[in-house]
């Protein structure tokens, strides 16, 4: 399941640099985090849904790569992002 248009717009407004910013690393990580959180709830009901689990692992991998890139290039923005999203306890 994908996010609704309203949910995506809210994430874009919160994490984007401008109103049409969909490609920055922060926005991509925030969207992936929202999708991952949504799928985690799905797997509590549908334990044997292995096809969707593969998609979840792909999203986690993509998010990890984007976070590594952001940490390497813009460490301050990386720290702010993980604090906002509640990652890396």
Swiss-Prot record:
GO BP of this protein: translation
CDD domains (UniProt xref): Ribosomal_S15p_S13e
Keyword rRNA-binding: yes
Disulphide-bonded residues: none
SUPFAM superfamilies: S15/NS1 RNA-binding domain
Gene3D superfamilies assigned: 6.10.250.3130, S15/NS1, RNA-binding
Quaternary data: Part of the 30S ribosomal subunit. Forms a bridge to the 50S subunit in the 70S ribosome, contacting the 23S rRNA.
Record NCBIfam families: S15_bact
Name recorded for this polypeptide: Small ribosomal subunit protein uS15
Gene name, Swiss-Prot/TrEMBL: rpsO
